[in-house]
Curated annotation (Swiss-Prot):
Keyword Transmembrane helix among UniProt keywords: yes
Role of this protein: General Rab protein regulator required for vesicle formation from the Golgi complex. May control vesicle docking and fusion by mediating the action of Rab GTPases to the SNARE complexes. In addition it inhibits the removal of Rab GTPases from the membrane by GDI1.
Membrane-crossing residue ranges in chain numbering: 79-94, 95-112, 132-148, 149-165
Region (Homodimerization) location: 175-185
Organism: Canis lupus familiaris
UniProt membrane topology term: Multi-pass membrane protein
Name this protein carries in UniProt: Prenylated Rab acceptor protein 1
Recorded family membership: Belongs to the PRA1 family.
Subcellular location: Cell membrane; Cytoplasm; Golgi apparatus; Cytoplasmic vesicle, Secretory vesicle, Synaptic vesicle
Stored PANTHER family: PRENYLATED RAB ACCEPTOR 1-RELATED, PRENYLATED RAB ACCEPTOR PROTEIN 1
Any matching Pfam family: PRA1
GO-annotated cellular components: Golgi apparatus; plasma membrane; synaptic vesicle
Superkingdom of source: Eukaryota
Length: 185
């Protein structure tokens, strides 16, 4: 039995991604599988932020080519940049934290209540989708006061600027087929 536990420990991944608590919080299913696929395709952060590989594109064609290739190559890294910007926005806005706490608190209360018995409102049983819509309706004034709309557009704008500038100015390694192309004389 002890040998089996040692084998399980050896089979577990090591490093930063192994110590992340997020995958343990997400139940198994499609969401967890998607997160695992994203984590598996993350490119090395050292090459992602290597300052020696940034330069201005020579022309519009090269700019477009860099945008397409970098977005395709660093797609998972860009997803985590987006999530980091969301986290930054939420952490730096205390009222938005309160609004999120109200929303998730209402969802949790509804969840606990449905475990005990069916949720009945005005003599009618309320479906789970309607319950979460009710939680959203209760927390909507808090989101409105917190300026959640402007936070959403800030995150989208900041994401476009950060990812767009990185994709436009980051040089990709030359692919073997591109090195062998001949220029017309």
């Amino acid at each position: 039995m002890a040998a089996e536990k040692d084998q399980q420990k050896d089979a577990e991944p090591e490093g930063l991604s192994a110590t992340t608590l997020l995958p343990k919080l997400i139940p198994s299913g499609a969401g967890r599988e998607r997160l695992e696929r994203r984590r598996a395709t993350i490119r090395p952060w050292s090459s992602f932020v290597d300052q020696r590989r940034f330069s201005r594109p020579r022309n519009l064609g090269e700019l477009c080519q860099r945008l397409v290739r970098n977005v395709e190559y660093y797609q998972s890294n860009y997803v985590f940049v987006f999530l980091g910007l969301i986290l930054y926005c939420v952490v730096t806005s205390p009222m938005l934290l309160v609004a999120l706490a109200v929303f998730f608190g209402a969802c949790y209360i509804l969840y606990l209540r449905t475990l005990q018995s069916k949720f009945v409102l005005f003599g009618r049983e309320v479906s789970p989708a309607h319950q979460y819509a009710l939680a959203g309706g209760v927390s909507f004034p808090f989101f409105w006061l917190a300026g959640a709309g402007s936070a959403v557009f800030w995150v989208l704008g900041a994401t476009l600027v950060v990812i767009g500038s990185h994709a436009a100015f980051h040089q990709m390694e030359a692919v073997d087929g591109e090195e062998l192309q001949m220029e017309p004389v």
